[in-house]
């Protein structure tokens, strides 16, 4: 009887050992993340105006500020300081997406104290990042708006006319004083064809940075 018990205990012991070993080997595999076991959540849909008509979320703004142009004398020289001002008109197609067009004028910093004057036309796409992340809120006091667009400039320097164009990016910080009025600060950086400062360089392009401050007025409409 004692021999039979010993014979039975040995297989049972081996079964238990193999079971524990197999479970230990499978455990890490079960704990590993498997992306196929999960479904991604759909991104939130962009909000829309209930009854959108062209121009029913119109806004106008006036702005002025400083510009920094790359020095024509040297790549590493201190950028020259210029001025610009403008008027813009825009419309919001939804609480997130909008567009504006602008008429601009100012002067670039040129060599030897000869500053090229310019007038220009611009068009920008606007994305209300705050509304995209936190939904639309008509009484919100602070908004962050991304800007991407292009600009054409007609330049005049010492009796000579020329033109230039380029693309620019900006980030507007908007403070809403009331449902009708707002103030904003907007830093921008742009890459332009060579010659906005009246001088051609070996790099064949110019860059311009600016900091604009503006006041705006928006039209009220139904949401």
List each language-model region with its residue ranges.
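Bacterial Sec-dependent N-terminal signal peptides
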Residues: 1-29
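Short glycine/proline- and aromatic-enriched beta-strand/turn motifs that initiate or cap beta-hairpins
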Residues: 24-90, 160
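N-terminal/domain-start segments enriched in small and hydrophobic, helix-friendly residues
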Residues: 33-38, 45-47, 135-146, 150, ...
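Outer-membrane beta-barrel proteins
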Residues: 48-50, 73-77, 89, 111-113, ...
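Residues that define the transmembrane beta-barrel architecture of outer-membrane proteins
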Residues: 56, 77-85, 115-121, 142, ...
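Residues on the lipid-exposed face of transmembrane beta-strands in outer-membrane beta-barrel proteins
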Residues: 62-66, 85-91, 123-129, 148-152, ...
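Predominantly the C-terminal beta-signal and adjacent terminal strand-loop region
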Residues: 75, 99, 109-118, 176-223
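Gram-negative (and chloroplast) outer-membrane scaffold detector with strong preference
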Residues: 95-165, 177-179
């Amino acid at each position: 009887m004692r021999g039979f018990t010993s014979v039975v205990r040995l297989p049972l012991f081996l079964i238990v050992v193999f079971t524990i070993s197999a479970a230990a080997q499978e455990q890490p595999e079960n704990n590993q993340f498997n992306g196929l076991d999960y479904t991604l959540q759909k991104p939130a849909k962009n909000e829309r105006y209930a009854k959108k008509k062209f121009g029913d979320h119109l806004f106008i703004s006036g702005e002025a500020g400083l510009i920094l142009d790359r020095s024509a004398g040297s790549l590493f020289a201190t950028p020259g300081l210029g001025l610009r001002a403008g008027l813009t008109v825009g419309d919001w197609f939804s609480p997130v997406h909008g567009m504006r067009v602008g008429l601009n004028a100012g002067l670039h910093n040129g060599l030897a104290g000869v500053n090229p004057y310019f007038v220009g036309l611009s068009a920008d796409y606007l994305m209300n990042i705050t509304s995209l992340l936190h939904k639309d809120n008509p009484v919100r006091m602070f908004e962050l708006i991304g800007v991407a667009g292009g600009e054409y400039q007609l330049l005049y320097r010492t009796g000579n006319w020329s033109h230039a164009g380029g693309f620019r990016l900006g980030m507007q910080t908007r403070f809403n004083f009331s449902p009708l009025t707002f103030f904003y600060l907007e830093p921008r950086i742009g890459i332009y064809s060579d010659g906005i400062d009246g001088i051609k360089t070996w790099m064949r392009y110019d860059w311009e940075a600016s900091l604009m401050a503006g006041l705006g007025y928006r039209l009220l409409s139904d949401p």
